[in-house]
């Protein structure tokens, strides 16, 4: 949370001008434009801007940082009124409804304590509809070992499947080399699961 007080969103290593892989995987999921979608750990990401442009109308965003969400709200202007905003710790989130698609780029890998990961998966299972889509991206094996001074956990498909358990079927995975605003390379891995 403090990270967003100290930096502009454009300076975060995970910042993307266009969330290409996320958008491609969301399109692959073929959810209806009025299906409920949540972007977990959205921070100051522009994914929600792109989803609005693609006519998705039932959007929710969640972040632990009120500052990050305020920045995104300001950027969106009047469009922000049509989005559900949640300032919450995802490991303790109580969703008011079930989602058809859950998107997380770069939150799960910050959960270094197995209890936090277990709680995240519990919230995920309770919040995602049967036949719902999970799109989750983390640092890949061989990627960064820390991010913004924080420890992370690297993943491959085997590790991610072990974390999520039997309720989720891996549909698709993609590797990305993300170029940070400081022009450094970071290895990410994206997964799309079906519940």
Where would I find each of the regions flagged by the language model?
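Conserved acidic residues
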Residues: 100
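Class I (Rossmann-like) S-adenosyl-L-methionine-dependent methyltransferase catalytic domain
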Residues: 1-97, 111-127, 133-195
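A conserved beta-strand element that flanks and buttresses the S-adenosyl-L-methionine
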Residues: 103
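Short catalytic micro-motifs in class I SAM-dependent methyltransferases
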Residues: 106-110
């Amino acid at each position: 949370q403090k990270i967003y007080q100290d930096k502009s969103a454009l300076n975060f290593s995970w910042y993307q001008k266009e969330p290409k892989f996320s958008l491609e995987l969301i399109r692959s999921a073929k959810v209806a434009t009025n299906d409920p979608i949540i972007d977990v750990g959205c921070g100051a990401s522009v994914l929600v801007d792109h989803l609005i442009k693609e006519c998705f109308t039932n959007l929710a965003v969640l972040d632990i940082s009120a500052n990050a969400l305020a920045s995104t709200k300001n950027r969106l202007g009047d469009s922000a009124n049509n989005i559900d905003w949640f300032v919450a710790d995802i490991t303790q989130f109580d969703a008011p409804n079930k989602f058809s698609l859950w998107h997380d780029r770069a939150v799960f890998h910050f959960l270094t304590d197995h209890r936090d990961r277990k709680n995240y998966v519990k919230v995920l299972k309770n919040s995602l509809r049967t036949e719902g889509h999970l799109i989750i991206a983390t640092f890949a094996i061989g990627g960064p070992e820390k991010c913004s001074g924080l420890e992370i956990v690297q993943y491959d498909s085997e590790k991610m499947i072990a974390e999520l358990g039997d309720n989720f079927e891996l549909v698709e995975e993609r590797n990305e080399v993300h170029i940070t605003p400081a022009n450094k390379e970071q290895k990410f891995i994206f997964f799309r699961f079906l519940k």
